[in-house]
């Protein structure tokens, strides 16, 4: 009886997650006999409650690449501190390769103002009022990783106080 309840809870947890395919690209590797084709999939998954992950998978078929990307995304989940207005506490920047992403909180009701893979990350993280700008690179993988890097660097007021060994009063 307990096992049935446990499996229902895990099914509920799994259904909360949303997955979006950012890119599926056919890539080649030059080997002795010629070229070997494979597929690379970039997936972003999130629960719209402050958790998001970026995953990359490669396989000889598209379905296998997507499955590998989903498992990679689950391994690379990050927690994002959200404010009461479904935004972020402060301005952050993230880098990955030549890509630079600047993410700023915006006024309530302004929505998600961002493009490409950065927009997908912010939507799946549950952020509703945000402004983001991609600089440097148009590569979706580097921009997604730069956005994730920026969101990792978010700090809350209480975490800063704890780091400085200060009290709230």
Curated annotation (Swiss-Prot):
This is Small ribosomal subunit protein uS5c. The gene is rps5. GO terms for biological process: translation. Keywords: Chloroplast, Plastid, Ribonucleoprotein, Ribosomal protein, RNA-binding, rRNA-binding. Residues 17-80 form the S5 DRBM domain. It comes from the Eukaryota. InterPro entries: Ribosomal_Su5_D2-typ_SF (IPR020568), Ribosomal_uS5 (IPR000851), Ribosomal_uS5_bac-type (IPR005712), Ribosomal_uS5_C (IPR005324), Ribosomal_uS5_N (IPR013810), Ribosomal_uS5_N_CS (IPR018192), Ribsml_uS5_D2-typ_fold_subgr (IPR014721). The lineage of its organism: Eukaryota, Cryptophyceae, Pyrenomonadales, Geminigeraceae, Guillardia. Part of the 30S ribosomal subunit. Contacts protein S4. Gene3D superfamilies: 3.30.160.20, 3.30.230.10. With S4 and S12 plays an important role in translational accuracy. The N-terminal domain interacts with the head of the 30S subunit; the C-terminal domain interacts with the body and contacts protein S4. The interaction surface between S4 and S5 is involved in control of translational fidelity. The keyword Amino-acid biosynthesis does not apply. Belongs to the universal ribosomal protein uS5 family. The keyword Cytoplasm does not apply.
